[in-house]
Regions:
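Glycine-rich His-Gly loop
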Residues: 69-73, 167-168, 202, 226-227
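N-terminal cap/lid segment of alpha/beta-hydrolase-fold proteins
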Residues: 20-62
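Primarily recognizes the serine-hydrolase "nucleophile elbow" in alpha/beta-hydrolase
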Residues: 138-216
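Active-site rim elements
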Residues: 121-126, 208-210, 273-284
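The feature captures the conserved acid-bearing segment of alpha/beta-hydrolase catalytic domains
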Residues: 186-260
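N-terminal signal peptide c-region/cleavage motif recognized by signal peptidases
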Residues: 14-16
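Serine-hydrolase catalytic machinery in alpha/beta-hydrolase-like enzymes
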Residues: 47-157
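Alpha/beta-hydrolase-fold serine-hydrolase catalytic core, especially in secreted/extracellular enzymes
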Residues: 259-328
Length: 328
């Protein structure tokens, strides 16, 4: 009788988990979920550096998890807004950073013929070091604003649940503050307040071992790239992007490879030099998987985790898209 009861209980639990997974929908948002946009500037007094940020605030008033986003080379806080809008509609405070020195100020006042040269020069070690220090500076200021009654962010932030994300140079920034070890020097810029990370167009180090760079990462990472994700600047090609996943050993890891997706797939518009037509389903997949990841690891949503750790993500993908995951 006891054995029969145990079997029935396990069957019921499996059925319940399956039902929760099948009903979970990372794309579902309410009609009243349009976020409020707040533009602010973080002043880093120690470095005398001003950092513009754009905050997508959800309609809820309770403290919500925070997701940071770092733009690619030449971008701004206004880029990839389709992500910020959706994440906020799902209940996250999405904070989009702008990094002076590697933002649109690099190219916008130059003749077209000079822009590529200027962008290449901005993809520098100096700007990398500025970026990885921008992230903790922003988190520090968010902690202050969260306690200031005069701030539009007062009481709105759950800073015990912080996700980090970024595209291209922003992915490099994300990797550095989320557990990467610099392959040559062994230096780390990890911010322990970050609990999960998404790298859009991740990169292996130019020199040194990817295994050394990523082998000690101990928080969940989601990696997204495309089969034609080659950056116009730098040496990051598809094999170097795929090497990141293989090098992660200690924490849950996920990888999406979108078929025929180019480097611009994670932005709002095509880039000069793109050869493939934009696939509208790519943004749907990006939003679904990133949201499920945040729900699982920032929202502690068991149904989202079960959905993510199953074949359900393939229901939003096209046949040739690739998906894999592992939990050590």
């Amino acid at each position: 009788m006891k054995l029969l009861f145990t079997a029935q209980l396990l069957l019921a639990m499996a059925f319940t988990a399956g039902a929760e997974t099948s009903s979970y929908d990372p794309m579902a948002i309410s009609d009243a979920a349009a976020p409020k946009i707040v533009d602010l500037t973080v002043h880093d007094a120690m470095r005398q550096r001003d950092l513009p940020i754009r905050v997508y605030l959800p309609t809820t008033t309770a403290p919500e998890p925070v997701v940071l986003f770092s733009h690619g080379l030449g971008g701004t806080r206004e880029g990839s807004k389709f992500m910020g809008e959706h994440w906020a509609a799902r209940g996250y405070v999405a904070v989009f950073l702008q990094h002076p020195g590697s933002d649109d100020s690099v190219w916008k006042n130059l003749p077209p013929a000079d822009r590529l040269r200027a962008m290449s020069a901005a993809a520098s070690l100096d700007n990398f070091l500025l970026r990885v220090k921008d992230v903790p500076a922003v988190i520090d200021q968010l902690e202050i604003w969260n306690t200031q009654t005069s701030s539009p962010l007062a009481g709105r932030l759950n800073l015990k649940k912080i996700g980090m994300s970024g595209h291209s140079f922003g992915a490099i920034t994300t990797q550095a503050v989320s557990g990467e070890t610099l392959a040559v020097t062994g230096q780390k810029f990890t911010d322990a307040r970050i609990t999960a990370a998404i790298a859009f167009s991740p990169s292996s180090p130019k020199t040194g071992s990817a295994a050394r760079a990523f082998g000690a990462v101990n928080i969940p990472w989601l990696l997204m790239t495309g089969t034609k994700d080659v950056a116009p600047i730098g040496n990051a090609d598809v094999p170097s992007r795929l090497a990141v996943y293989a090098s992660l050993k200690l924490a849950p890891k996920y990888e999406l490879v979108l078929n025929n997706a180019e480097h611009s797939v994670f932005t709002d518009r095509a880039l000069p030099g793109d050869r493939e037509p934009r696939n509208p389903n790519h943004h749907r997949v990006i939003l679904a998987l990133s949201t499920a990841f945040w729900d699982a690891y920032l929202g502690d949503d068991a149904a989202a985790l079960a959905w993510l750790n199953s074949d359900r993500p393939r229901t939003v993908m096209e046949t040739a898209d690739q998906w894999q995951f592992a939990a050590p």
